[in-house]
Design a protein with these regions (language model features):
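Conserved binding/recognition cores within well-folded domains
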Residues: 1-61
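DNA major-groove recognition helices of helix-turn-helix
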Residues: 28, 75-76
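C-terminal structural segments of small proteins and small subunits
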Residues: 57-60, 67-70, 74
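Tandem repeat protein-protein interaction scaffolds
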Residues: 79-80
Length: 80
């Protein structure tokens, strides 16, 4: 559903379980298909098909509000 950077780890949140991996957000971003996942903040990568709602400031996935960084505005509209 989404990936959150936590210092030198990433937290991978899925429908059923959360995982922690020791890698950078950039490393995991390079492994993901760009048509399915987008980085919307320096600390967050999201699965586009899991977006429940969004506005100019944040995306909602699994009832969690994820901020959209200033440099990433417009990515959601272009991707959907």
């Amino acid at each position: 559903c989404y990936i959150e950077s936590q210092k030198e780890y990433v937290k991978i949140v899925t429908q059923s379980k959360d995982y922690i991996a020791k890698m950078s957000t950039k490393e995991i971003e390079e492994m993901l298909p760009t048509n399915l996942f987008k980085r919307i903040h320096r600390s967050f990568i999201i699965a586009l098909d899991k977006i429940e709602s969004f506005n100019a400031e944040m995306v909602e996935i699994k009832e969690v509000n994820i901020p959209i960084g200033r440099g990433y505005k417009g990515i959601i509209e272009k991707s959907l």
